[in-house]
Amino acid sequence: MLALLALVLALAGFSACSGSDEPGATQSPGVVRVAGGLISGTEVDGVRAYLGIPYAAPPVGDLRWRPPQSPDSWEGVRTCVRYGPSCPQPLGDGLSFFPLGETDEDCLYLNVWTPGAVAEGDGTGGAAEGTTDGAADGAADGAAEGAAEGAADGAAPLPVMVWIHGGGFSTGSGSLDVYSGIGLARLGAVVVTINYRLGPLGFLAHPALSAEDPSGASGNYGLLDQIAALEWVRENVAAFGGDPENVTVFGESAGGMSICDLMVSPPAEGLFARAIVQSGPFDSSGAGMDAVRPLAEAEETGRELSRRLGCDEAPDELAALRAVPVGRLLRAAERTVPRGPGGLGFVPVVDGVVLPGDPAALFAAGELHDVDLLVGANADEADLFLLGMRGATAAQLTRYVRRLYEPDDDAVLELFPDDEHGSRKAALSKAVTVMGFLAPARFAAASVAEAGADAYLYHFARVPPAVGDLGAFHGLEIPYVFGNPVLVLDVTGGVDGELSRAMMRYWVSFARDGDPNDGVGAAAGTGSETASGDDEAADAALPSWPAYDPAS
């Protein structure tokens, strides 16, 4: 049971790496020039990894609750072989299965994985010579020469996949072991994972913050971080062999919700061509969660937090709030925001600027960016959320349903009767899964297709033996997408290995040109085409995946 609980917590996004190097990494002198200066990374299984790259200035002090700023430049070559700190988040001792490792407000870092064969044109030779004798100029010259050599080779730029992690907008990190991009990079993609501000640091609105900002709004600092990371990718990913005009954002849970927000956000337009949304509906009311909040409501929450912290009577309220130690801020925030059954607290804000309206309504109206979409959910999403209700009585579960779905609770109980699902708990799990995840995923696919872009819909139903009596719960698909084992769940061999390789190939093919049915063997006749040349990865051609038809 402990192993199962640990697996569930890991996939729910509660565990982050402690800032260590990639397993099996050997330090490489390969040097790449990015905004800010020169960086070197590591090589793991033939893939170059650059970890802990700053994409924005530390959002600390006076930069707390401000849009992300450009990072400071540095002299010489910055060694990027360790993950940066995760963003502060409220994790208690009860989750000691996975120590979070280092957290810090200085957390706006990203990680890049790129196939070594592509990254060879990064100035390795000249850079190594330059850094050996301490000459930064030599490193820069080497980088330029290497880049020119890479361009001369005529290698086509690779598709770029940017992962936005989940965690209810309050927990998580881009540096989880399960998010390592090695496997996807070996299939021919440049993979980027990012951190963004969470909880009250990422999504606090307050009238004084709105008045201070030229836009007249506040509350979407976490989304602005994601946009800043995408801008960094557009400006720098070519140095890693990636195509800045061929970027796919993909994410799960709150990461998927974020992507839906970005698909209707004016500042994000043009920063990505495709999106993959895993179990991240833009409208999560069917799961008892408010994925966005109106600005006025969010500002009132900010007022209450300030009162709770004793900052509302200060001569300079914002200065007082910015001086509050982060631990105290997080504890006060947990007491300030009433959490519904779904568990979301601080969330993105409909501010009229970053989010011009409710994303669900904008999708329905076709007011979204021209972005191809691959979207889906798992067969038993809610089994994770109901894990703590194993011993609940039918009466307790009924009260939960009524609280979750009022004033439509009677209709829900009628639509999902116990006798059709075996028990009240099974019926509740199906209700939350269908209304909170499966139906919104289908609606998102239909909205995109009706707007004229391509959409593909999936349904993940695999239940590996390692999960016991749980079904295909929320987050279970993540190890399959990245090809990374998690504790007792091994996705590298057997049936689960085959499924993982298939999903990875579909995902990378979609990232390449918006069609999962080509590129790395996802269509008949192309089954042997893999970037890695790995016989195990070069399975037979996968079944054809038809585009979503709203009429179906």
Residue ranges of each PLM-predicted region?
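Surface-exposed helix-capping loop/turn segments at secondary-structure junctions
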Residues: 114-121, 237-246, 311-315, 447-456, ...
